[in-house]
């Protein structure tokens, strides 16, 4: 259960320090360029015993910085965990880049985060040092609700940065000329569009998977007014964005504008067009961060017809597979097991595959129910990834979570209990989400295991009460996440009154089909299993698919154990989605189910040693 002690709302403090970054060269001890960065140490949240902080490194120079290495030391505070960097040392602490964030392009920044204990003191603001740092800094104060730009990721995460400049692969065209008459550009010149509305610069980006990417446009606007742009992905089929490009004061003064967009798997054509008759500012470069990306093909655009939305599908199904009973699964052994001191179980997982990385939020139990986050790129190394506790963070514990990206708000949402609540973040890798907010007005007693899915017009909130009834609340897409009232989806009071329709409802949209899948956990004569139904609308009616103990959606009776049976029953979990947004799409041709399995008995339910395993549907 959740710790109901409220974390004090402390105004986050930001202190900037200067630090040096190691630049690559013939010898690491000698910098090939006098590249430096400004380091910002941010107290993100603080409570009675601990704190979370972020260190942001910003490249204020005109040259790329490669391979950074920073240090800091506390008087009384101690670091307990961190993310988005490789850490070593025990006060002083050292952080070095991971494989995907070691290069910082001019004007760009990276961040890493940490959690610590105050040890009777206040949250300290240590000086961050490095090998070479000449950049001036100033102090500032940030809102306590600020969200770090980057954060948690396991050491196995892989991503890449792409820099597109004129006369290079991936630069497709400019409606104008390539000029070099103003200093400060970084390539062979800069793109100077015609002074006309609609004049454009076009790039091509090849992404290995669908997902969110961060685009940074380096530009100079020496005019007296904004020269804003309209950014279109694949002709508008995968996104339309407005980019603010204010004046920089001179044509030799370069600044950056950053925007998060959704790219589809394969080739993407990105077009930035002028919205005024003055045309665009001078455009020096476009950089792309997130996932694995490379220069694309200017002559083609990946078809978006098989991708339901800019983030609704990370795969392109080549066939339509009918999901019909009986179903057969194979199970892995335990892939994620308790490894932190005192942890007894890990259960109730929510899993999102985003930018080639699996992100898992889950419940763990030590002396109470708490929450954790982990991420990895390969199931074979899942257990080696850090298990980061969310206990004491701003969001607190988020038992039985569901995580997804809500496109209309351009934010990640986490749905949790008790009572029903939601939290948000701009970065799924950051386990310090916003403070929880109420989800359902008029929520009945005992409501749990909340699940959200949306179509093009409405969002649906499913939940249980351990009373043999499945409930739903409905709101418009524009009104999300505000739900009010509820109705009954179905009820089944056989057995002891709740065992046939128990908990852990999941609802998904099947890729390429006008068909939805509903799963609900049950227990009848033996261990837990899942029943299932399908419908052509989220409003129902729901038709049984595999809904008995003998013919379950997933349970002991239809699972083969490739490495030996280790779990008794198939309990609370999620299918691995083909996308990551609110439409909850799954590929019926390649279903995988991350579930909690009881690996042994417990003296009480709370002490059952649950672990996480993966089911794969047999074809």
From Swiss-Prot:
GO terms for cellular component: extracellular region. Pfam families: CBM_2 (PF00553), CBM_6 (PF03422), Glyco_hydro_62 (PF03664). Keywords: Disulfide bond, Glycosidase, Hydrolase, Secreted, Signal. Residues 38-136 form the CBM2 domain. Pathway: Glycan metabolism; hemicellulose degradation. Gene3D superfamilies: 2.60.40.290, Galactose-binding domain-like (2.60.120.260), Glycosyl hydrolase domain, family 43 (2.115.10.20). It catalyses: Hydrolysis of terminal non-reducing alpha-L-arabinofuranoside residues in alpha-L-arabinosides. SUPFAM superfamilies: Arabinanase/levansucrase/invertase, Carbohydrate-binding domain, Galactose-binding domain-like. InterPro entries: CBD2, CBM2/CBM3_carb-bd_dom_sf, CBM2_carb-bd_dom_sf, CBM2_CS, CBM6, Galactose-bd-like_sf, GH62_arabinosidase, Glyco_hydro_beta-prop_sf. Acts only on high MW substrates, in which arabinose is linked to a polymeric backbone. It comes from the Bacteria. Belongs to the glycosyl hydrolase 62 family. Residues 1-37 form the signal peptide. This is Alpha-L-arabinofuranosidase C. The gene is xynC. It comes from Cellvibrio japonicus (strain Ueda107) (Pseudomonas fluorescens subsp. cellulosa). Xylanase C contributes to hydrolyze hemicellulose, the major component of plant cell-walls. It is found in: Secreted.
């Amino acid at each position: 259960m959740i710790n109901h002690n409220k974390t004090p709302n402390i105004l986050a403090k930001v202190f900037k320090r200067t630090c040096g970054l190691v630049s690559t060269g013939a010898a690491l001890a000698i910098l090939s360029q006098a590249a430096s960065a400004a380091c910002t140490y941010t107290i993100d949240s603080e409570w009675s015993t601990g704190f979370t902080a972020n260190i942001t490194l910003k490249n204020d120079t005109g040259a790329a910085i490669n391979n950074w290495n920073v240090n800091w030391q506390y008087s009384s505070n101690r670091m307990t965990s961190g993310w988005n960097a490789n850490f070593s040392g025990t006060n002083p602490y050292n952080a070095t880049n991971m494989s995907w964030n070691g290069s910082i392009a001019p004007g760009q920044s990276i961040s890493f985060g940490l959690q610590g204990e105050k040890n009777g003191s206040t949250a300290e603001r240590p000086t961050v040092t490095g090998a070479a740092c000449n950049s001036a800094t100033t102090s500032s104060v940030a809102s306590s609700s600020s969200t770090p730009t980057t954060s948690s990721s396991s050491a196995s995460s892989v991503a890449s940065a792409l820099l597109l400049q004129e006369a290079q692969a991936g630069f497709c065209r400019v409606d104008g000329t390539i000029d070099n008459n103003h200093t400060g550009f970084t390539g062979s010149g800069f793109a100077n569009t015609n002074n006309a509305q609609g004049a454009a610069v076009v790039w091509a980006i090849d992404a290995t998977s669908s997902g969110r990417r961060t685009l940074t446009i380096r530009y100079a606007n020496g005019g007296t007014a904004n020269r804003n742009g309209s950014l279109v992905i694949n002709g508008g089929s995968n996104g339309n964005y407005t980019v603010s490009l204010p004046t920089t004061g001179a044509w030799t003064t370069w600044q950056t504008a950053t925007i998060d967009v959704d790219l589809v798997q394969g080739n993407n054509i990105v077009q930035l067009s002028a919205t005024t008759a003055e045309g665009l500012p001078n455009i020096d470069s476009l950089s792309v961060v997130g996932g694995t990306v490379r220069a694309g093909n200017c002559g083609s655009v990946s078809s978006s017809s098989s991708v339901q939305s800019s983030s609704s599908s990370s795969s392109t199904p080549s066939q339509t597979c009918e999901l019909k009973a009986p179903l057969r699964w194979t199970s892995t052994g335990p892939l994620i097991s308790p490894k932190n001191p005192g942890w007894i179980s890990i259960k109730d997982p929510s899993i999102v595959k985003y930018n080639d990385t699996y992100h898992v939020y889950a419940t763990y139990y030590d002396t109470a129910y708490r929450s954790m986050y982990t991420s990895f790129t390969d199931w074979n190394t899942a257990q080696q990834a850090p298990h980061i506790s969310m206990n004491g963070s701003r969001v607190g514990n988020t038992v039985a979570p569901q995580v997804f990206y809500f496109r209309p708000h351009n934010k990640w949402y986490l749905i949790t209990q008790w009572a029903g609540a939601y939290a948000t973040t701009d970065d799924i890798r950051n386990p310090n989400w916003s403070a929880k907010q109420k989800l359902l007005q008029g929520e009945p007693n005992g409501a749990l295991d909340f699940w959200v899915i949306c179509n093009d017009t409405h969002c649906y909130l499913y939940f249980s009460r351990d009373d043999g009834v499945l409930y739903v609340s409905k709101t418009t897409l524009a009104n999300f996440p505000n739900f009010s009232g509820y109705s009954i989806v179905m009820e089944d009071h056989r057995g002891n009154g709740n065992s046939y329709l128990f908990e852990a409802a999941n609802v998904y949209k099947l890729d390429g089909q006008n068909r939805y899948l509903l799963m609900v956990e049950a227990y009848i004569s033996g261990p837990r299993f899942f029943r299932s139904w399908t419908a052509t609308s989220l409003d129902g009616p729901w038709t049984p698919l595999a809904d008995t103990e003998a013919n379950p959606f997933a349970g002991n009776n239809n699972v083969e154990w490739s490495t030996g049976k280790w779990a008794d029953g198939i309990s609370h979990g999620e299918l691995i989605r083909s996308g990551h947004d609110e439409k909850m799409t799954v590929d019926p041709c390649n279903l995988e189910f991350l579930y909690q399995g009881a690996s042994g008995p417990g003296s009480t339910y709370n002490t059952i040693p649950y672990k996480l395993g993966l089911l794969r549907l047999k074809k």
